[in-house]
């Protein structure tokens, strides 16, 4: 109701990566979101995880507020400037041994004054 811009919520330890909008009623995401949320996985969880699990399409279809979901291990890197917030999802292809390769799986930007995710 207060229409506050630039609201970003960071959470973690979900063992998955997520990015999406937050609405007052998440079951009916209509209009502009009230905030943006980034959920980061942990880098030290058991198992290598996967980019997209078997239920990916179904899960995304019933959660239209989400713009990204990934189950690989890693971390997020966030940068805030006066004009844009940027979040990078860094993931490893495996953590089960030391040969895992780190990559940037997805990057999102939020322009100042907005509560909308944009792939960067």
What are these regions (language model features)?
Residues 1-120:
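Long, structured stretches of catalytic cores involved in phosphate-ester chemistry, encompassing
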